[in-house]
Amino acid sequence: MAQHRKLGLPSDHRRAMLRNLVTSFLKHGKIQTTVTRAKEARSLAEKMITLAKRGDLHARRQVLSFVTEEEVVKNLFTNIAPKYAERNGGYTRMYKIGPRRGDGAELVILELV
């Protein structure tokens, strides 16, 4: 059975939040978020990139079922995936930027390598 972090949210809210995080990440190439959210988003984003590397119609439809914007999917298949054609995983980099001012949660920047 697949394991996942609960992130203190109901399952539908967690899924929606992760879809939005991954979509924003693939759109901008970089996002700032908390460590645990970044770890979950990183895993899903890497799966999307690996699917996009296949490049077939079924892979495109699978990515479209998760990523919320069609333009992002188009960019993923035409620009991002070919860039990582020779790389087997490890498409992202995560580095800490210190605690958030309001609640002290540890923040990271997640970016494409």
From Swiss-Prot:
Keywords: Ribonucleoprotein, Ribosomal protein. It holds the Pfam family Ribosomal_L17. GO terms for biological process: translation. GO terms for molecular function: structural constituent of ribosome. One of its GO terms (cellular component) is cytosolic large ribosomal subunit. It comes from the Bacteria. Part of the 50S ribosomal subunit. Contacts protein L32. Belongs to the bacterial ribosomal protein bL17 family. PANTHER family: LARGE RIBOSOMAL SUBUNIT PROTEIN BL17M, RIBOSOMAL PROTEIN L17. This is Large ribosomal subunit protein bL17. The lineage of its organism: Bacteria, Bacillati, Bacillota, Clostridia, Eubacteriales.
